[in-house]
Amino acid sequence: MFTGSIVALITPMDEKGNVCRASLKKLIDYHVANGTSAIVSVGTTGESATLSHDEHADVVMMTLELADGRIPVIAGTGANATSEAISLTQRFNDSGIAGCLTVTPYYNRPTQEGLFQHFKAIAEHTDLPQILYNVPSRTGCDMLPETVGRLSKIKNIVGIKEATGNLSRVHLIKELVNEDFALLSGDDATAMDFMQLGGHGVISVTTNVAARDMADMCRLAAEGKFDDARIINRRLMPLHHKLFVEPNPVPVKWACKELGLVATDTLRLPMTPITDAGRDIVGSALKHAGLL
């Protein structure tokens, strides 16, 4: 089962917007050293929307190579066309990745039956473990617990990243899935409470810059030491929120650069650099967390 603090890793780039291998290695080494449970490569935070399919696959494979078996790598493989999601997923069938994170189709807003058929078709074309990803604030599409329950009966659909921030979803989904189905928060600000209600971990933006703290918080929560976990979470709470003061991954890329984890905070259009006001806000949150 996928558990603990899983990082939604940024994709570091050089000043020309090309993927920076040296910075990627530095990031991976940082997460290995600080107890991160797994890496999600080229998800939303990894700027999947501005990478070509070939670049997307190249970054995942580079991440897998640089990880060198030290930490599991999960590939982001979502698309809003089922055939495209299948094609992207199949690129990794024999790669050695730990699984795939597949977002609900965005913009075209399928019905619940459409969502079921979409994920069922992907699962039928691969043996890789599949983690569903529900983030309606970005996709315009909300996968309901009943649909998750139906999909959980498919052998290689093994978990969900639930990013609504609606904590009632934990109980509703738990009632419909088996105990081995991984319930992962996709919302850092509510992840601690999500785990207290029975979740197994978080796929996190904050972990990019606070890997040890997030790993410790998740470990303590898993051990039932919620008072201790909450002490860490309280210190990180401004960061959980302020990393979204501008569109993700703009603030977290800047924060990674500020902490010396990457060489630049270069983004690809239509994403633009963090504003001066954004720097002040995120910098203050980093200081509150004890990271600066």
UniProtKB/Swiss-Prot annotation:
SMART domains: DHDPS. Its EC number is 4.3.3.7. Belongs to the DapA family. Pfam families: DHDPS (PF00701). The active site is at Y133 (proton donor/acceptor), K161 (schiff-base intermediate with substrate). It is found in: Cytoplasm. One of its GO terms (molecular function) is 4-hydroxy-tetrahydrodipicolinate synthase activity. HAMAP family: DapA. The lineage of its organism: Bacteria, Pseudomonadati, Pseudomonadota, Gammaproteobacteria, Enterobacterales. It catalyses: L-aspartate 4-semialdehyde + pyruvate = (2S,4S)-4-hydroxy-2,3,4,5-tetrahydrodipicolinate + H2O + H(+). This is 4-hydroxy-tetrahydrodipicolinate synthase. One of its GO terms (biological process) is diaminopimelate biosynthetic process. Keywords: Amino-acid biosynthesis, Cytoplasm, Diaminopimelate biosynthesis, Lyase, Lysine biosynthesis, Schiff base. The record marks T44, Y107 as: Part of a proton relay during catalysis. InterPro entries: Aldolase_TIM (IPR013785), DapA (IPR005263), DapA-like (IPR002220), Schiff_base-form_aldolases_AS (IPR020625), Schiff_base-form_aldolases_CS (IPR020624). GO terms for cellular component: cytosol. It is an enzyme of class 4 (lyase). Transmembrane segments: none annotated. Pyruvate binds at T45, I203. It comes from Cronobacter sakazakii (strain ATCC BAA-894) (Enterobacter sakazakii). It comes from the Bacteria. Pathway: Amino-acid biosynthesis; L-lysine biosynthesis via DAP pathway; (S)-tetrahydrodipicolinate from L-aspartate: step 3/4. Gene3D superfamilies: Aldolase class I. Homotetramer; dimer of dimers.
